[in-house]
Amino acid sequence: LLALAWLLLPAGPASAAQLAGVDLPDATEADGKVLVLNGLGLREATLMMVDVYVAGLYLEAKSTDPAAIVAADRTKRLVLKFVRSVGRENLVKAFSDGLDKNAGERAAAVAPGFARLNAAMDDVKKGDTLILTYVPGAGTTVRLKDVDVATIEGEDFQSVLFSIWLGPAPLNRSLRDGLLGVDR
């Protein structure tokens, strides 16, 4: 009887996933939709593999197919929690490199959106968060250090933006695998 009573107790708070000492919730909400944590990854940079941020990808439904995630005109969110300070110029360079490697023939069409994204960037410190949320019909909201700094319209823009992490030439393959939930 006690075992049955234990099973009927209400569940505790939503659990969280952890990577490199950073906790991210298993779910979040955007535009009235619940988004589930698809996976976590660690961005490592330079030849010395310096930890830069922990990223979490949130989707309406889990998926391990990067092309389908990028192409889907559905609400999605990428959360970057920085584990070290990064200068604005390094953030802009990373976005520019990702654009060059993943935009292909869409580069000219999405260049104005990336110019707005780069203009919205600022230096980040350890503990700061960058959140990129795409909502169909509304665009991609860029939230940096708890402030909405830009909303960039266009399904093409979000597709190229999310390709930086999920496309054929991602920032790190291990980061992409983590975001797809296949590395854990």
Where does each model-flagged region fall?
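N-terminal structural module
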Residues: 17-69
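Flexible glycine-rich active-site/ligand-binding loops centered on an Asp-His dyad
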Residues: 149-175
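Cysteine/selenocysteine-centered motifs that mediate thiol-based redox chemistry or coordinate metal-sulfur cofactors
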Residues: 174-184
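Bacterial N-terminal signal peptides
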Residues: 1-11
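Short strand-turn-strand beta-turns centered on an Asx-Gly dipeptide
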Residues: 144-147
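Short polybasic amphipathic segments
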Residues: 26-28, 139-142
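Sec/Tat signal peptide C-region and signal peptidase I cleavage site
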Residues: 12-16
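Mid-length scaffold segments of soluble, non-membrane domains
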Residues: 60-137
